Regions:
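Alpha/beta catalytic cores of nucleotide-metabolism and tRNA/nucleoside-modifying enzymes
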Residues: 2, 8, 110-113, 137-151, ...
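Conserved beta-strand positions in the central sheet of alpha/beta enzyme cores
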Residues: 22-23, 55-57, 82, 153, ...
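Conserved phosphate-coordination/catalytic loops
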Residues: 60, 102, 106, 166, ...
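Short glycine-enriched, charge-decorated loop/helix-capping segments at active-site entrances
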Residues: 96-102, 161, 227-230
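Alpha/beta enzyme core
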Residues: 11-16, 67-81, 85-95, 106-186
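Glycine-rich, positively charged N-terminal anion/phosphate-binding segment
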Residues: 3-72
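An active-site metal/cofactor-coordinating segment within enzyme catalytic domains
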Residues: 37-38, 43-47, 90-101
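Active-site beta-loop-alpha junctions enriched in small/polar residues
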Residues: 1, 27-29, 59-61, 86-88, ...
Length: 297
């Protein structure tokens, strides 16, 4: 998730409840292949050893640039490469990137081929949706399988549906049937709220795994079912917030507005008397020093 799953966030999750695999934020393949864009985008590909195994995620519509980015991922030491064919944002799809590639299956296959060519043997996955304006799960997944990705991660909504309707897990199940026949790993995504629900969905629909997005954003302990976030003390949550702010500042410095960090405040500052008032004060902060002063007082 853009402006969420950076290295700072992933290190927090790794501390609380590491998943089986981490994915980076999606990064523009075109930007990484431009002299001006690469320096600005490289922090999005930063990671620490405690985030392994970790997969680099790219978006774009230029096969040659995916080849180059795959080579870059190998050079940086990533454990896998993911091609984003699922982002529904208008500014992405209008350039045939993200979910826009669902409308152009031949280009999508060419991108997969070029990514694999540059990947040096690293596994290559595709993250996508069940359709663009309408559901075309079986037709679309069949096209992708022809390019022989190592895995397909499928979100159970169309581009048009965004996140406005419940995920169509029956369609994810249809994709799973096709992938199993082809020997392609299949991972489902959409509306997973608990660890137990994820395991249940994987079993019910014959999946190799599930990917969690928004569920882990609100609960850093998501991948450790033995931990109930409600039992965490204010002191524990505040300590975790301080660590997150420190990591965020070390990673981004002045290259990303501090307001991006503020979306996490409710995750840590909630569940006790006075938390709302403290959170409102924290929302006025402009940097880690402001946060430190408020948390000390």
């Amino acid at each position: 998730m853009a402006d969420v799953t950076d290295s700072a966030f992933r290190q927090i999750i790794s501390t609380c409840s590491p998943p089986d695999v981490f994915y980076t934020e999606f990064v523009s393949a075109d930007g990484l292949c431009s002299e001006k864009g690469r320096p600005k985008l490289m922090p999005h590909l930063a990671f620490k050893e405690n985030e392994r195994p970790i997969v680099a995620q790219f978006f774009g519509a230029n096969p040659e640039n995916f080849y180059k980015c795959a080579q870059l991922a190998v050079e940086l030491g990533f454990d896998g490469i993911d091609i984003n064919m699922g982002c529904p944002a208008g500014k992405i799809v209008k350039h045939d990137s993200g979910a826009g590639l669902i409308r152009n299956p031949e280009l999508a296959k060419e991108i997969i081929h070029e990514t694999k060519r540059g990947a040096g043997g690293l596994p290559v996955s595709v993250k996508t949706r069940i359709g663009y304006n309408k559901i075309v799960t079986e037709e679309w997944i069949s096209h992708l399988i022809e390019a022989e990705p190592d895995a397909i991660i499928i979100h159970g909504r169309t581009m048009k549906e965004m996140s406005k309707v419940p995920a169509h897990w029956d369609e994810i199940g249809k994709a799973a049937v096709l992938c199993r026949k082809a020997g392609v790993l299949i991972i489902g995504n959409g509306d997973i709220k608990t660890h137990a629900e994820g395991l249940e969905k994987a079993k019910q629909y014959g999946l190799d795994g599930v990917m969690v997005g928004r569920g882990v954003f609100s609960n850093p302990w998501f991948f450790n079912p033995s931990v109930d976030p409600a039992t965490k003390t204010p002191e524990e949550k505040i300590t975790l917030l301080k660590k997150h702010v420190k990591l965020f500042t070390e990673l981004w410095g002045n290259n990303k507005h501090f307001d991006v960090m503020k979306k996490f405040f409710k995750v840590y500052i909630s569940g006790w008397e006075g938390a709302k008032e403290l959170r409102m004060e924290l929302m006025k902060s402009k940097n880690k020093e402001d946060v430190a002063k408020l948390l000390i007082s």
